[in-house]
Amino acid sequence: MQSLSTPHTISLLLPRTSPSRLSPSLHSLAFPTRLRSLSYSSQTSILPDAGDDFIVGDCLVYEDGVFEDPYLDKEVTQVAKQERKKNRRGGAKRLDESEIEPENLVPEEWRDIQAEVNLTKKDKRKIAQEMEFGVRVEKKRQGLIPLRKVDLNDFLTYKEAKLAQLRPVILDKPGNFSDDSGASSDGETAVSSPSERVAPKNPRWAVYGKGFDHVAKFFNSDKYDPSDKKSDGPRKLLSKEEKFMLNSRNPDLAVATSKKWLPLHTLAACGEFYLVDSLLKHNLDINATDVGGLTVLHRAIIGKKQAITNYLLRESANPFVLDDEGATLMHYAVQTASAPTIKLLLLYNADINAQDRDGWTPLHVAVQARRSDIVKLLLIKGADIEVKNKDGLTPLGLCLYLGREIRTYEVMKLLKEFPLSRHKKRLVTTDEDIE
């Protein structure tokens, strides 16, 4: 049997595990280089040589300081000390440090393409502005370039050639063309030779395509003579009624109108503020109604012309006028959802709870339109939610017939919550008065 104190038996007894890097016991583990064995019965010895390394499991364990070189350590420590001293003094450059200059690896032939690719949008915009400015400067420097000399004879020959190619038919005094039945015996129709341009049949076409300014300029010019009675004169452009109104210098605007649209109504609906002002200076009836029973205020409110509505009310237009169905101006303002017009009519003491012939109030109209903003405005201004129409429906009851939509629920919420909040405010004010 072998002795238990031999290295071979020790390696067999120890477990074969890989050493951990974190375990400090491997660094402190040291084995003697020479071991004395116990006495054997035989003279053989299994001890290894003194210079061999001992195997513990699968690892080789070396002595401390085997791979250390004292001369190399001294040089490294000296260099590190020198670097620390230089860094402390002023941050000098490290040893053996050389600056590397930037080098462009793009060939010279591609440098222009590289510069174009690297341009930003801002640079491109500046270049375009500079180019445009440079073109303008060059044009100003050049000045007016004289046209090339054109020969008049060449132009006339070119014109005649083009006219011969197009073959235009120009008739100023055409004769009476005969029909196919009135052809000559030879089968050829007689065509008069063109001589001059045809005069226009309708003299009104002379001012066709021109505006009011051109017509006014024509009447104010010297060419217009009111005393001229020639058939070919400028007055032929006007009808007899227009000539009479023009000669009277005080036109009757009530005559120059259609049955449905009065001039004042038309201009108010179009938003022509200055023309409305000029017409009212001719003593027109500002409360005149058309065929449908609408006044100028109705037309201005329907067209949402706030400036004209305010102007007409200042010019003493009737804010309490009714149409044929008994609707007030407040009904029309609510129907058009014009909050400024509603506030303006309330300043002129318009009735916010007025009913038409069917018993509808402005609040009914706002609920039917499902405009929560107009409903809220009317409730704030004091609209009554308990007024019923001829069908016995209040504004809240009317909501039940409008379907299940989000806008309908918003209107119902306003109608149910707003009276409660107003009732609470009244209770608070009464409690304060009692105290």
From Swiss-Prot:
Gene3D superfamilies: Ankyrin repeat-containing domain. Keywords: ANK repeat, Chloroplast, Plastid, Repeat, Transit peptide. Its main location: plastid. GO terms for molecular function: molecular condensate scaffold activity. Induction: By light. Residues 178-195 have a biased composition (Polar residues). SUPFAM superfamilies: Ankyrin repeat. Residues 11-22 have a biased composition (Low complexity). ANK repeats lie at residues 259-288, 292-321, 325-354, 358-387, 391-424. GO terms for cellular component: chloroplast. It comes from the Eukaryota. Expressed mainly in chloroplast-containing tissues. Also detected in roots, stems, flower buds, developing siliques and dry seeds. Residues 1-22, 175-199 are annotated as: Disordered. Residues 1-36 form a transit peptide. Pfam families: Ank_2 (PF12796), Ank_4 (PF13637). It is found in: Plastid, Chloroplast. Disruption phenotype: Plants show a developmental arrest of the embryos at the globular stage. Interacts with EMB506. No homodimerization observed. Involved in the initial differentiation of the proplastid during the embryo development and in plastid differentiation linked to cell differentiation, morphogenesis and organogenesis during the plant life cycle. This is Ankyrin repeat domain-containing protein, chloroplastic.
